[in-house]
Amino acid sequence: MKIFDYEDIQLVPNKCIVNSRSECDTTIQFGPRSFKLPVVPANMQTVMNETLAEWFAENDYFYIMHRFDEEGRIPFIKKMQEKGLFASISVGVKEREFGFVESLAAENVIPEYITIDIAHGHSDSVINMIKHIKKHIPEVFVIAGNVGTPEGVRELENAGADATKVGIGPGRVCITKIKTGFGTGGWQLSALNHCSKAARKPIIADGGIRTHGDIAKSIRFGASMVMVGSLFAAHEESPGETVELDGKMYKEYFGSASEFQKGEHKNVEGKKMFVEHKGSLFNTLTEMQQDLQSSISYAGGKDLNSLRKVDYVIVRNSIFNGDRDQNL
């Protein structure tokens, strides 16, 4: 089993067949809808809120609303659908969440997407929730995770998941690997590679994305969609407190299993950090799309599929070559 991560890999260019990168198509079909980019903001409180969810849906980007305002989920679905927008929500696996799914069916409030969102998704509780959703609201596109093994992907798919989310603790504000000794931190791209070979349905790569080039690498190794946390945090539109430190503006960014999200110091597997303010989210999305178009042109194609076929080399932590401060 080859073990590598994002910084260990460079993709090998092919002959370019376009006159301009603007000819390259970054759209992706994911479930019942098509989206401008194969990228989704992490369903975290410091990355996604209702205002941003609305903006993403209006502009043909995929989003997943976090699950930390449980009472607000049904009103959120109704509001989005009244505006002619798709609804994409998260659920956990506690007993009350099974009742919540039944209430969606009873009230005929059916979101287009539901993400079952727990840290260790290869579990009986997630399998039971997948089956529960498919029994009561079978038309919903169900994303389940997170897993880090081919066995996990297969079991969730066999239970009825329409997509699986791969990544155990590789994110910047996740400390699972330190607290538990388990995870895909440091070999997330390799884990994605192995999981995608077992998958029959789409995979979301979740965690460890530090640069726009990592998005192209995720697609090369089997992702249909790439979940991004820290790169989407700390924008003008982002949730979270803004602070000034040494004359620079920063925004808070914390993990979904941190004490700042939980409100208590118990079973903590996340931390809080401050990320330098990045300006407009629209500008970041535009740059992300342009960089991905460039990636497609280097791959020798016109769409995302060309990225899946390119060769790669393993270069062991040398891609930055002194060009980038790795503390960023």
From Swiss-Prot:
Residues spanning the membrane: none
A GO biological process held by the record: purine nucleotide metabolic process
Gene Ontology molecular function: GMP reductase activity
Reactions performed catalytically: IMP + NH4(+) + NADP(+) = GMP + NADPH + 2 H(+)
Active site: 174 (thioimidate intermediate)
Superkingdom, taxonomy of origin: Bacteria
InterPro entries, per the entry: Aldolase_TIM (IPR013785), GMP_reductase (IPR050139), GuaC_type_2 (IPR005994), IMP_DH/GMP_Rdtase_CS (IPR015875), IMP_DH_GMPRt (IPR001093)
Function according to Swiss-Prot or TrEMBL: Catalyzes the irreversible NADPH-dependent deamination of GMP to IMP. It functions in the conversion of nucleobase, nucleoside and nucleotide derivatives of G to A nucleotides, and in maintaining the intracellular balance of A and G nucleotides.
Record family assignment: Belongs to the IMPDH/GMPR family. GuaC type 2 subfamily.
Name of the protein in its database record: GMP reductase
Species this protein is from: Staphylococcus saprophyticus subsp. saprophyticus (strain ATCC 15305 / DSM 20229 / NCIMB 8711 / NCTC 7292 / S-41)
Gene name as annotated: guaC
